[in-house]
Amino acid sequence: GKGLRTAKDTKRGQKMDGITIRTAVPADLDAVVQVEAACFPAAEAADRKSLKERLDVFPQSFLVAEDGNRIIGFINGAVTNERTIGDEMFEDTSLHEPQGAYQSIFGLDVIEEYRHRGVASRLMKAMIERARSQGRRGLILTCKDRLIGYYETFGYVNMGISKSVHGGAVWYDMILEF
C-alpha cells in the first residue's frame, strides 16, 4: 500500500544494502582478527588470544557486521558493575560479570572501505538495543578525544580523562545510562 511498510520492507530495512548485523560465532575468529589488525595500531589492537577468549566468554555481547559472507566490522565488550573500563578488563575475561549493570564496549571496528556508510552506527545501536533488552543500566566505553562528539550522538556523556593508558594513548571515559 501507499506509505505503508510491509513486513518484507521492514526486514529489508535491517539488512540495508546487503549488510547484516548478527551475533558472532567461534568460526568468525580469523575474520575478526584481520578486521582488528586493520583498524587499530599494534599497541592498541586486541590479539588473537584475547579475541578468541571474548568470543568464547561473552558471545552475546560480540556482534559482527557482514556484507554477504564477509565480516566488515564488529563490536564487543564484557559486562561489568563498574562505571568505567579499567585496562585489566581488556585482558582478563574472568572480569566479565554476566549479570552486571553495564555493557562495556572494548572495540567498535569497521574496515576502511566500509566507513562513512553507517555501519558503525548500526553496530552501536544494535549493542545499545541488546543491553537495554538484557536489563542493563547502560553502556560504557573509552575513546580518544576526536571521537567524543561521535559517541555523544548516541547519548553517551563524557566523564573526563580515563585512568586507562591502553596502548600509551589518552582516553576519555564515556557512559550512556538508560
Predicted regions located by residue number:
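C-terminal "cap" of GNAT-fold acetyltransferases
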Residues: R137, K144-D145, S164-F178
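Short, low-complexity, charge-dense intrinsically disordered segments
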Residues: A7-M16, I128
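Hydrophobic adenine-recognition pocket in adenosine-nucleotide-binding enzymes
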Residues: A24, L108-V110
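Active-site rim helix/loop that mediates acceptor-substrate recognition in acyltransferases
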Residues: A42-G68, N76-L95
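A short beta-loop-alpha structural element at the N-terminal edge
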Residues: I19-V32
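Conserved acyl-donor/pantetheine-binding loop and adjacent beta-alpha core of acyl/acetyltransferases
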Residues: F74-L108, R115, K125, V165-W171
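Conserved acetyl-CoA-binding loop of GNAT-fold acetyltransferases
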Residues: E152-S162
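Conserved GNAT acetyl-CoA-binding A-motif
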Residues: M124, A131-C143
